[in-house]
Amino acid sequence: DCDYTCGSHCYSASAVSDAQSAGYQLYSAGQSVGRSRYPHQYRNYEGFNFPVSGNYYEWPILSSGSTYNGGSPGADRVVFNNNDELAGLITHTGASGNGFVACG
């Protein structure tokens, strides 16, 4: 079930919800994992028009279906706010430099 498409990766709403839950759990505990210390603040330099406001945080969502645990984050991210509301999915796939584009 393809609720979101990031490049060639397909994600169901439940996979997105699971990833968001894992990321928010660490955020609310003040913890992070990996070299880039996820979840970390996402400043929305790209100017995406997210359906929720707030301070945004990015967390890797893995096409393998596994929960991110500190290894390679891949290209795809779940973005949530400090109230645990989903802002959307973004990806480095198809973006220039270190930028992001919205997932479909």
Curated annotation (Swiss-Prot):
UniProt cross-references to SUPFAM superfamilies, sorted A to Z: Microbial ribonucleases
Pfam families in the cross-refs: Ribonuclease
Coiled-coil residue windows: none
UniProt key word Mitochondrion: no
Principal location class: secreted
Subcellular location: Secreted
Enzyme Commission code: 4.6.1.24
Protein keywords: Disulfide bond, Endonuclease, Hydrolase, Lyase, Nuclease, Secreted
GO MF annotations in UniProt: lyase activity; ribonuclease T1 activity; RNA binding; RNA endonuclease activity
Gene Ontology annotations for the cellular component aspect, listed alphabetically: extracellular region
Top enzyme class: lyase
Catalytic site positions: H40, E58, H92
Catalytic reaction list: [RNA] containing guanosine + H2O = an [RNA fragment]-3'-guanosine-3'-phosphate + a 5'-hydroxy-ribonucleotide-3'-[RNA fragment]
Disulfide bond residue pairs: C2-C10, C6-C103
Matching InterPro entries: N1-like (IPR000026), Ribonuclease/ribotoxin (IPR016191), Ribonuclease_N1/T1 (IPR051386)
Family under the similarity heading: Belongs to the ribonuclease N1/T1 family.
Name of the protein this chain belongs to: Guanyl-specific ribonuclease Ap1
Organism whose genome encodes this protein: Aspergillus pallidus
Species classification: Eukaryota, Fungi, Dikarya, Ascomycota, Pezizomycotina
